[in-house]
Swiss-Prot record:
Pfam families registered for this protein in UniProt: BacA
Residues spanning the membrane: 1-21, 44-64, 87-107, 114-134, 150-170, 190-210, 222-242, 251-271
Name recorded for this polypeptide: Undecaprenyl-diphosphatase 2
Primary gene name: uppP2
GO terms for biological process, alphabetical: cell wall organization; peptidoglycan biosynthetic process; regulation of cell shape; response to antibiotic
Class of the enzyme per the UniProt entry, highest EC level: hydrolase
GO terms assigned for molecular function: undecaprenyl-diphosphatase activity
Protein topology in the membrane: Multi-pass membrane protein
Length: 276
């Protein structure tokens, strides 16, 4: 893997994992648009992807470090019988993580095999854009509540939304923000809940494959560089997005981008079919 391609993929992962535009979809579509081929069976790819996931998760953990300390403290306080908002929210995050954890372990590889056609990925990106636009309308029409007041049923519903992101072209953060809006969260709080909810999933995706990173010691330098670059890009992304949604930013803007990008990619790959 060339240095510039390594930098490109690392930054692409760090940005699109958190922006509601589908990191997996972009990782498949963008290199193909530029005629770059990603060999899924290349020995250096898996340890590299492991490092990218860990870099993203560490960036999220660092950005929300004070929040996580409060959540963990509240969780143990609640176990000791002292009910509190942070403990309730921590339980909500645990419940929201369960659906994707189970389905991801059972079906992720099968889903990847079905959605290997880039034209299907482009269509999924278009649908993702439409859903973001609809989610924006939902957010503006609902009464708002704090994440700490979410019911466990609502948290489970938001967690179910993450399952859609197993399909390339659908965004994990986008779908969970939409579900958070439907549960009555403001755009800012839906984004925060989405990032908190996604942290264990993204972290687990890296940790489960961590042994393979150390088995490929000749690839450690590339993986380490990729992880650092992804962490920087992810940190800057989450910082931007939280400020964006605090300032009345809208999901619809990302929806428009996804539709335009998806239509362009669909047309391109219909005219230039890729080998499958």
């Amino acid at each position: 893997m060339s240095l510039w391609f390594l930098v490109f993929l690392s930054v692409l992962q760090g940005v699109t994992e958190l922006f509601p535009v589908s990191s997996l979809g972009h990782t498949l579509l963008v290199p193909a648009l530029f005629g770059m081929h990603i060999d899924k069976h290349a020995p250096q790819l898996l340890p590299f992807l492991v490092a990218l996931h860990l870099g993203t998760a560490l960036a999220l953990l660092w950005y929300f470090r004070a929040r996580w300390v409060a959540l963990i403290g509240g969780f143990f306080a609640q176990l000791g019988g002292r009910k509190n908002d942070d403990g309730h929210l921590m339980w909500a995050l645990i419940i929201g993580t369960i659906p994707t954890g189970i389905v991801g372990l059972l079906l992720e590889k099968r889903i990847e095999r079905v959605f290997h056609d880039l034209r299907i990925v482009a269509i999924a990106l278009i649908v993702n854009g439409v859903l973001l636009w609809l989610g924006d309308r939902i957010q503006r029409s609902r009464a708002h509540q704090a994440p700490e007041k979410m019911t466990f049923k609502q948290a489970f519903f938001v967690g179910l939304a993450q399952i859609g992101a197993l399909i390339p072209g659908f965004s994990r953060s986008g779908l969970t923000m939409i579900a958070g809006n439907a549960a009555g969260l403001t755009a800012e709080k839906a984004a925060e809940f989405s990032f908190l909810l996604g942290t264990p999933i993204i972290f687990a995706a890296g940790v489960l494959e961590l042994p393979k990173l150390f088995h490929a010691r000749d690839q450690l330098a590339d993986a380490l560089l990729g992880g650092v670059l992804t962490a920087i890009a992810a940190y800057l992304s989450v910082r931007f997005l939280m400020r964006y949604f605090e300032g009345r930013g809208r999901l619809a803007s990302f929806g428009v981008y996804c539709v335009i990008a998806g239509v362009f990619c669909l047309g391109w790959f219909m005219l230039h079919p890729q080998p499958v």
